Regions:
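A generic structural signal for short
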Residues: 16-17, 78-79, 101, 133, ...
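Small/polar loops that bind or transfer phosphate-bearing groups
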Residues: 19-20, 47, 103-104, 163, ...
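Asp-based, Mg2+/Mn2+-dependent phosphohydrolase catalytic module
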Residues: 1-7, 92, 108-110, 114-215
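N-terminal helical cap/lid subdomain that shapes the substrate entry/recognition surface
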Residues: 2-97
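Conserved SAM-binding loop
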Residues: 17, 83, 101-104, 137, ...
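Non-catalytic, surface-exposed connector residues within folded enzymatic/regulatory domains
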Residues: 45, 66, 81-84, 106, ...
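Short phosphate-binding/catalytic loops that engage adenosine nucleotides
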Residues: 97-99, 177
């Protein structure tokens, strides 16, 4: 870690900040069985990827894209957006210590508007919120996390990524940023080799632990 330079915490959203991945698994699992029965565990295959990438890759037909998007937006309107245990307090602790916080989500602005309605405090919790519209490539490409670090001209060794999905973990590691796997969506065993450190949730994590890992 380089002293006297910004420290940045880069958070994926679903499954890291918000406890929503199990709900998305239900939706995308049903979509996969309906439209792509030849792809087992479709919900796991697409986790962490932007909606645009998912549509272009698996639903090239424009009419089918509209149908899937309509079903998704209706589903998101009725989702519950609870916080992952401990994450709210952890983010507040980071702010108290001057750590820059960035949401790096594959979700689009339409989905995030549902989050803001459910949590009016969400926007002011973070220094920046990056959505799929900000990225030129979907996870597992590292572009999104490199962009998050660049916003504050932070050295990569001063940054930490928090991710739950395989694609997100690959993006963090490909960016050459210390990557913490959050075992909410996938088991500890399955993400251990893809992470630099693994936590179950944020009740067991703190600013001091983050600094210890970055030093």
């Amino acid at each position: 870690m380089i002293k006297d330079r910004p420290i940045v915490a880069l958070f994926d959203n679903d499954g890291v900040i918000l406890d929503t991945e199990s709900q998305y698994s239900i939706f995308w699992g049903a979509v996969g069985r309906k439209y792509h029965p030849e792809i087992p565990n479709f919900d796991h295959v697409i986790k962490g990827q932007t909606l645009v990438y998912i549509l272009d890759t698996y639903f090239p037909d424009k009419d089918l894209q509209k149908q899937v998007v309509g079903e998704l937006y209706e589903f998101e309107e009725n989702m519950e957006y609870g916080y992952i245990p401990g994450v709210y307090d952890f983010i507040q602790e980071l702010k108290e210590h001057g750590v820059k916080t960035v949401v790096v989500t594959s979700s689009d602005q339409s989905k995030m508007n549902h989050v803001y309605r459910s949590h009016p405090e969400f926007k002011v919790m973070f220094d920046r919120i990056l959505t799929s519209e900000d990225f030129k490539a979907s996870k597992p490409d590292p572009y999104c996390y490199l962009l998050g670090a660049k916003l504050f001209n932070a050295p990569l060794e001063n940054c930490m990524v928090f991710e739950d999905s395989f694609n997100g973990l690959k993006a963090g590691k490909a960016a050459d940023i210390f990557t913490v796997g959050v075992a909410t969506t996938n088991s500890r065993d399955s993400i251990e080799s893809k992470s630099d450190y693994v936590i179950d949730d944020f009740r067991e994590f703190s600013y001091s632990k983050m600094m210890d890992l970055l030093h």
